[in-house]
């Protein structure tokens, strides 16, 4: 199963927030997910990003591919740098 870390859109019309989820790459954007690892609220000021580092690092090390947007959010949250450091330490 090819897994991706991507955003799942939630919320009302014109007031979106997103959950960072691990899903099969063939499932629809808002379809079934394997696990939720955080959320992103672009409407709130300042922008709110929460990521469960342990879960995110687990899925990244097992081969889950993040979307471009999720990769940018992981960089802002500081998780991506930890993943790169752990990968280079091996």
Swiss-Prot record:
Top-level taxon of origin: Bacteria
This protein's GO CC annotations: cytoplasm; small ribosomal subunit
Entries under Gene3D superfamilies matching the protein: 3.30.1320.10
GO MF annotation list: structural constituent of ribosome
Keywords: Ribonucleoprotein, Ribosomal protein
Biological process, per Gene Ontology: translation
Family: Belongs to the bacterial ribosomal protein bS16 family.
PANTHER family (UniProt xref): 30S RIBOSOMAL PROTEIN S16, SMALL RIBOSOMAL SUBUNIT PROTEIN BS16M
Protein name (record): Small ribosomal subunit protein bS16
Organism the protein comes from: Moorella thermoacetica (strain ATCC 39073 / JCM 9320)
